[in-house]
Amino acid sequence: MQDQDKYTNASAPQAIPPRATAPGRMNRAYLTVDLEEWYHLDYLKGFRCRESGVRVLPQIFDFLDMLDEEGVKVTFFCVGEIADENAGILREIVRRGHALGCHGLDHELLTNKSLEQFVDETRRAKAMIERAAGREITGYRASCFTMERDKLDATRQLGFAYDSSKIRFAQHPLYRNLDLSGFEQAEDLVYVKDDFTEYEIPTLDIMGYSIPISGGGYLRLFPFWLLRILLGIYARRHENFTIYVHPFELTDVPLPLPKGLGKATAFRCLVGRRGNLKKLRKVIRWLKKRGARFITLEADRRERGLR
């Protein structure tokens, strides 16, 4: 590994350029999927949920069909350890024209891994996914957005061209505000350094509090009428938007949650799953009506002249 200083600069990202669209109108929308099993949830660490035999990834085809109906291409980030057993799904994702990236080897938090361990495991995960999918992958997303700067620099050394792990959400104990010193902000949510791109997960700042309106449990929790209001506020301030979802949120297949999990944690895992796919379709259509063009992160890079 080369010294990380090669990619580090004391300057902060530059101020965002003027928006290309009128307030209330959207430019680009990036729909992303963390391709993992339900037992990868950080809430379930320490339990032996994997042994239940219940899997949600085989239900992903309803989601893929919905994307086809809406004419939307998305970016998937796959956990390496499940790639081989889901090779058919990965190849179908690629066949339908979606982008595929890496979501780590085992979904453990990067803050719990040394740089050396991260490099070794990421190299292995990349090879697993590429073998299963039959194509090269160039994108990365850290589990629970726990990317750190030295590991971000390492992804470039490992052959990745873009990452999507940055989120501004200080109120969440897991998330980190990723250091992007030396990057320039190309436009809303998009940061570039040389030929490497970082895509941010948006939050909405209201009265000093960051509201994560872009996906995950918050997409499940918020009713659509509230999401519509929050997205309307967001659209007046920003022109690009990133959504992130997980396969277990796109199906209502019963999950055998372990005893002793706790009511609050069980609520976080289960709230809003039923009907969430329909709600996501509504969000997609809302963004389209405001001019948003859905595009994969790979295609976005190509349009910027990056490879």
Question: Which positions does each model-derived feature cover?
Answer:
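Conserved, mostly hydrophobic/aromatic
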Residues: 34, 67, 103, 140, ...
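Active-site-adjacent pocket scaffolds in enzyme catalytic domains
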Residues: 131, 135-244
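Metal-dependent polysaccharide deacetylase catalytic core of the NodB/CE4 family, i.e.
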Residues: 70-151, 160-161, 165-166, 194-205
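The substrate-binding groove and active-site-proximal loops of carbohydrate-active enzymes
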Residues: 47-54, 78-79, 106-118, 138, ...
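C-terminal domain-boundary segment and adjacent tail
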Residues: 68-70, 222-307
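Active-site beta->alpha N-cap acidic-glycine motif
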Residues: 7, 16-17, 21-96
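Short catalytic/ligand-binding loop motif for oxyanion handling, primarily in non-cytosolic enzymes
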Residues: 39-41, 84-86, 108-111, 147-151, ...
